């Protein structure tokens, strides 16, 4: 039996006039398989060539903007012109799949891995209680803003169609937003307005790169995680205020990252409603919205897009497990979409062994290292 998901393959025109061929997006994936210097390895090349064909948008994950922000082994980077050949190769592969390539701009902040850092010292908005990370100085904050901008410039030069500012998860930008990790008493901390100052300054600097280049067609996105656990974690009320500020800027999309697309609000807003509904209402049509979170099959994507809470549906694990995912969705063959890693398909799946713990297998959910 097949299903009709043809509406997922209708084009969508962003607010800058760029038309995306369909409503499916590859979520940014940290691949852990680049070469140690961040250049394209054989494993990364093989993965990129065999995953994401037929998607509308393809966000390549966690592109490093500063050597002091590296959290993962290898990790794609946009630090200098020496990185252009690998950036260009990623662009060429993604375009060959028929997708629009977007580079996600990343800094790990206090979650940078000391083993990968020049001085073995992670830095963030505030020093951590255990002393493992130190507080960024005013000068370092200003420098990081410009490094995000320079990374965007390099990605533009490499041929990327746009960039996504990584303001989701537990990394640098949300570290500034969250009272749990930002205990500053200067203009970068305290009130929500002050805690949003750094992420918005980064976004403004990236937008400035686009405007100075006269590239109306260049896509700018921003990724958020709606809520954090803990007494001082980011609340839905704070997120809705942030969304309002972010989408006042001329961005093309807001990307919402969470465990499950349909999760209801935890606190800080109407808990009878989904986070996605409230966020989409707050965006109020100023940009597109991309939703992610346990979207695996065509039925999942269809339910997300027809909810009215998102313009695009993004997948990560399902893309890793199903090299031909978009083709299967277009054919309405949810019955052929794998939800778990099948060892008999390891070769045809083109999934580097380092990524196996990041996808569920028949014995249970992903076993993250």
Outline where the language-model segments fall.
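Flavin-dependent oxidoreductase catalytic cores
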Residues: 1-369
